[in-house]
Amino acid sequence: MKDTYTVVAFDFRGHGEHYCENETDMSQDTLVNDAIQVFQSICTMFSDRSIVIVGHSMGGSIATKAAAKITGEHKGEAWARQLQGLFVIDVVEGSAMDALPFMENIVTSRPPEFKSLQSVVQYGIKSGTVKDLESARVSMPPQVVAKTDDVSGTTKYVWRTDLLATKPYWEGWFKGLT
C-alpha cells in the first residue's frame, strides 16, 4: 500500500499537538477553512495525485462540508480538481444531534486531571472511549498536556482542550449533513 498511497493526517485546532492563534474558535466555518488550507497544501505537495478526504465523527462532518466547498466555490481551480472522493465514518446527523443534550454531562463527568500518562490511557479503556489498549496508547496521550505545579513541582496531566468551551459550536458541526 505504501508504494501506491500516501496518507496525510492532521490535527484540528484544539486537538493533538497542533496549536494556532485562536484555539477557541472551533466554529464550523473556521474548521472547514482550516481543512481546506491543509487540503490546498497537500495538493501543492502532491500535485500529480488524486486525493480522497477521509473523516471520522466531527472530522467527518467537517470533511463533508469542506469537500462541498471545494467542489462548489473552488471547482474551477486546479488544486480543487484533485479531490476525487470522500469517505465519512461514523457521522449521522440525527444520532449526533440527539446525543448533544447529553454531551455536557459526559464532558463534566471526565476526571479533570491525571497523575500520569498511563492513567490517561487506563481512563480511555475504562470509560469506553477506546476499546483496546494499543489504540488507547496512541489516541489518549495527545488529548492531555503536562502541567507542573509551581509550588510542589509535581506534574499532572490535564485535558488539552476545554470541551465545554466548544459547546456553542456542537450543533453546527453536525447540522445539515443529511
Model-found features: residue ranges?
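Short "lid" loop at the C-terminus of a central beta-strand within the Rossmann-like core
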Residues: G14, V92-S95, A146
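Conserved serine/cysteine hydrolase catalytic core
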Residues: D149-T178
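Conserved catalytic loop of SAM-dependent methyltransferase domains
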Residues: S135-Y157
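Active-site loop/oxyanion-hole signature of alpha/beta-hydrolase fold enzymes
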Residues: K2, V8-V54, A68-A80
